[in-house]
Amino acid sequence: MQYSHHCEHLLERLNKQREAGFLCDCTIVIGEFQFKAHRNVLASFSEYFGAIYRSTSENNVFLDQSQVKADGFQKLLEFIYTGTLNLDSWNVKEIHQAADYLKVEEVVTKCKIKMEDFAFIANPSSTEISSITGNIELNQQTCLLTLRDYNNREKSEVSTDLIQANPKQGALAKKSSQTKKKKKAFNSPKTGQNKTVQYPSDILENASVELFLDANKLPTPVVEQVAQINDNSELELTSVVENTFPAQDIVHTVTVKRKRGKSQPNCALKEHSMSNIASVKSPYEAENSGEELDQRYSKAKPMCNTCGKVFSEASSLRRHMRIHKGVKPYVCHLCGKAFTQCNQLKTHVRTHTGEKPYKCELCDKGFAQKCQLVFHSRMHHGEEKPYKCDVCNLQFATSSNLKIHARKHSGEKPYVCDRCGQRFAQASTLTYHVRRHTGEKPYVCDTCGKAFAVSSSLITHSRKHTGEKPYICGICGKSFISSGELNKHFRSHTGERPFICELCGNSYTDIKNLKKHKTKVHSGADKTLDSSAEDHTLSEQDSIQKSPLSETMDVKPSDMTLPLALPLGTEDHHMLLPVTDTQSPTSDTLLRSTVNGYSEPQLIFLQQLY
């Protein structure tokens, strides 16, 4: 028994493995971009990769950037794994160049056809009627308009509607004088109505005169539409001609015979290539129709086919598509972590170098990201907090803080632990919680080597070495290293005791004192209850980590975690550059070749990045 969708299912699975980097045994390197894939899949579609992998067992294949662009190769890779190829005017050349270099013949053929179509649309007036010269008796030097049969009224039809609308102009639909069969009407592709041919009144009055127009003297453009051609039928070539004298503007029909032969599909212009004659109000409007088409085509804004988002440039769309495809071409050469955007990689590298380029003008404090500087200014220097809660009127420095705060009112907890089922309002809180299960402590102190599960805990701990105490009590002036310590001290002024023992009702100002009490007095109590109290009663540090927003204060800069921060293990500790707490490293410090702990390729990577 054969399953009809087995091949599609296999390709779908392989593509998901590629996007996840699972079982990928090769990496295609194009400049700073890296693409993971499977050798057997590439070799099956590309003669180039087939030849490469027959002669080498190397995992990395480096491609020439001048021959294969990263964006073109990405589209080609998607076609190989999915069978889908989206070609447009701004990527077809890159894809064709990549496919031709890598010998993917099927894509080369598709691209050639598409490029011909785009060239036809961009230059519709360049359609050559000479391609059917052998089958059509047409004099290219002169255009002959003969009205011999005008006086024979019964053989002509005049559009009375048009005459009523414009008394100065009439319409003439010429019947065939060379066949007894009823001629089919030439219909508009859009309206389906019969075409009417317009003549100025002075020409109609002298209709018995043969008018010869020299084709070489005709001003451009001449817009041509050719009707469908059948055997033994006549070819109607309708032309809009702008004469040198405005009063003599003419829209005329030329009827020529064609010899027997197969129909010529190239004769009929595509509907969208030129405007319909029926819709032409004045011959002057056709003067720049080709240029207007090119402008409309070039001004078409690229749009994402997945989410419908519109972009001003094709390059922005290509960067956006990496989000949908899961492509992360920007790779940190120091730790191997990959990112979708180049600016994300630069921000991430600062976790290695310690660089903080964004300085506060008031307190000279440095930050790795601009958004952190904005947050700091709003929190500590009186700048406006533009985001206000509709329920309690609290104001916040960032929209994300307001969104998290709103979940306190709604009770929403969208982040669920897949190990124990506990729910959280913040993604970062879930991350910290999972580390309780795994025991992971990726943040290591440079001075003493102590490890922490949360970056804010490391920041607070480092102040013990530097002596920094930025949090000052407004009542007595005493300073502290963390907001948790300040809150604990402040309770000594207010007398508040928020931590209550569930067994005996005693209350304490500090969670540590509550734990000591339970250990000393209730050591034989149910451990489950004690564990539950730990989960629902937060310590001062946990309050910072898990609930950065309280009802009375915003998150502090020290409590924020870098969204792109790299979890450093003990073995990665040597990769941090030696910098002080008060000054960010200069470019010379970052790029000097004598930095310990970096290999030569890593130093080259840093120099190229900056």
UniProtKB/Swiss-Prot annotation:
Q: In which tissues is it expressed?
A: Mainly expressed in the neuromuscular system. Located in and around synaptic myonuclei in adult muscle. Expression is dysregulated after nerve injury. Also found in the testis, ovary and placenta.
Asked whether the UniProt record includes Zinc among its keywords, one would answer yes
Q: Cite the residue spans of the region called Disordered.
A: 169-197, 521-556
Organism's domain of life? Eukaryota
Spell out the InterPro entries in the cross-references: BTB/POZ_dom, SKP1/BTB/POZ_sf, Znf_C2H2_sf, Znf_C2H2_type
Position of motif Nuclear localization signal? Answer: 174-190, 257-262
Q: Which PROSITE patterns match?
A: BTB, ZINC_FINGER_C2H2_1, ZINC_FINGER_C2H2_2
Supply the name of the protein.
Myoneurin
